Amino acid sequence: MLGARRLLGALRLCSSVSCPRPRASAKMRVRDALRVQDARGECVTVQGWIRSVRSQKEVLFLHVNDGSSLESLQIVADSSFDSRELTFGSSVQVQGQLVKSQSKRQNVELKAEKIEVIGDCEAKAFPIKYKERHPLEYLRQYPHLRCRTNALGSILRVRSEATAAIHSYFKDNGFVHIHTPVLTSNDCEGAGELFQVEPSSKIKGPKESFFDVPAFLTVSGQLHLEVMSGAFTQVFTFGPTFRAENSQSRRHLAEFYMVEAEISFVESLQDLMQVMEELFKATTEMVLSHCPEDVELCHQFIAAGQKGRLEHMLKNNFLIISYTEAIEILKQASQNFAFTPKWGVDLQTEHEKYLVRHCGNIPVFVINYPSELKPFYMRENEDGPQNTVAAVDLLVPGVGELFGGSLREERYHVLEQRLARSGLTKAYQWYLDLRKFGSVPHGGFGMGFERYLQCILGVDNIKDVIPFPRFTHSCLL
């Protein structure tokens, strides 16, 4: 019966005199079992899913994986086990002796004494087929099952390791982690691409809405971090962000994760750029150190040549050009762009990728953008008629924009005038108040986490580096 637990048998047969006394068996993750250097027949129990089955005359070989590593643990069983019950994708619990492997392919193997099938897997109905390398596009149809493949397993382990590495970098450098709200009445980016939130059933009574003001899913934690930067000199947040962008491009999602930081007493973009570059390199080096096999799988089967490109990024200092210089480079390019580069017009993805190639595929900071292209909170440069702001974007190979940041406008009267011109004074009076009471020069940045993963792994489509992608016309599960 489907899902029924079945005990398949024992490898060790009882002797003619007596059966050996049952021994205590320690549960062990596959990753930990594979790391044992001097296996001497310890009795262990492993739980996981069958990745392969190979039957010979007198011996049965299984490979079991529990998600803790890319590599699976080889299980060796004798012919008393019924191989028909052990199918690809089934969940099992195996008890046996961990011994040194006779094969050069692995260091250890598990000699099975008991194999228990926990959950069957019907091979014909299972969309993931044995020994088949499914394209990532195909797997997107099955968000509830695709994590069982090697490719998605590796991507998600890298994602987990990168998350830990980011927290480690900020903790080691004295940043305070702030939980910024998911529900907000602010539009940080000013783009209007917001998801408005309302109760599923309308509130009865005189109040027009649950919060008495329109509420939205956050597009950024920046403004809340700026509040905190009035009490803590270094803060960061790392959480979900939402944009109602009607786009199905390879670079955009409706729900994604942002790493954002705010630093007080910062007076130059150079200080911000240093932190951005350090964060990128420290995180990447930790990922490469802690899960090299997973990164290698992505580089080998998803993005050939990505390993060399990544090493090139890590060993070189990031470059810096101004927005004005970037426009001049684009104007002189022999490439025909779909969007003509022009001063005062935002850079498009095609422009960003060209600039990175022009800079030798080294990440490049583009600084000092025209003020009309950027939100009200960015600090105005004192550069006369150009009227630019102290903004910075980091462009990286294969992706384009990865980081965006700026110095914040800390001067009360300048900010007051910008809010007035935008008709936002009433909505952001609290933000002006921050400049009244102990204001300091400060700045910050945000990094799209999924784009970061695309960059280091070479994954072309952003929908393949997040467990459950949400985008226009798609919210599966």
Swiss-Prot record:
Modified residues (N6-acetyllysine): K353
Top-level enzyme category: ligase
Transit peptide: 1-14
Keyword Mitochondrion found: yes
Coiled-coil ranges (or none): none
Family annotation (InterPro entries): Aa-tRNA-synt_II, aa-tRNA-synth_II, aa-tRNA-synth_II/BPL/LPL, Asn-tRNA-ligase, Asp/Asn-tRNA-synth_IIb, NA-bd_OB-fold, NA-bd_OB_tRNA
Alphabetized GO MF terms: asparagine-tRNA ligase activity; ATP binding; nucleic acid binding
Enzyme Commission identifier(s): 6.1.1.22
Location in the cell: Mitochondrion matrix; Mitochondrion
One GO cellular component, as annotated: mitochondrion
Tissue specificity note: Expressed in brain and inner ear, including the cochlear epithelium and organ of Corti.
Family annotation (SUPFAM superfamilies): Class II aaRS and biotin synthetases (SSF55681), Nucleic acid-binding proteins (SSF50249)
Keyword Aminoacyl-tRNA synthetase annotated: yes
Catalytic activity from the UniProt record: tRNA(Asn) + L-asparagine + ATP = L-asparaginyl-tRNA(Asn) + AMP + diphosphate + H(+)
GO biological process, one term: asparaginyl-tRNA aminoacylation
Keyword field: Acetylation, Aminoacyl-tRNA synthetase, ATP-binding, Ligase, Mitochondrion, Nucleotide-binding, Protein biosynthesis, Transit peptide
Similarity comment text for this entry: Belongs to the class-II aminoacyl-tRNA synthetase family.
Listed NCBIfam families: asnS (TIGR00457), PRK03932.1 (NF003037)
Function: Mitochondrial aminoacyl-tRNA synthetase that catalyzes the specific attachment of the asparagine amino acid (aa) to the homologous transfer RNA (tRNA), further participating in protein synthesis. The reaction occurs in a two steps: asparagine is first activated by ATP to form Asn-AMP and then transferred to the acceptor end of tRNA(Asn).
HAMAP family documented for this protein: Asn_tRNA_synth
Subunit relationships: Homodimer.
Protein name: Asparaginyl-tRNA synthetase
Species of provenance: Mus musculus (Mouse)
Organism lineage: Eukaryota, Metazoa, Chordata, Craniata, Vertebrata
